[in-house]
Amino acid sequence: QIDYVEGNGSRTIKGEWHFSRVLEGMAIQDVIILPDYEYGTTLRIFNPHTRAWDVAYGYAGKIIRLEARKQGEMIVLTCTGDENRKWVFVRIDDKKFHWQNVTVQNNGDWLINAEIVAERIR
């Protein structure tokens, strides 16, 4: 179960985000369901040459490519076409996680465009 909140706080959407291992454990796929807003799927495959995850997110006629790396306690996914656009798993624990869609400003500050607080249901 997830709560999707737009950065300006104008809208909160209840949804679901399902994760599973696919391709005999070689990849992780997820499906995100945000009713009346967005439905999408992501495929993450570890690249041994770059020591990072190659990521593709597809939704409603569009695909976004990213590269994911661990940075301290966070997992940071950077858009391959725009290094200022990032998706960040800020905090992950056994029961919940916190995700943010951010844009890096010219001064280096992160502008939060949207965030998700998710509770794990097993």
Specify the residue positions occupied by each region the protein language model found.
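Hydrophobic small-molecule pocket/channel-lining residues, especially in calycin-type beta-barrels
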Residues: 1-122
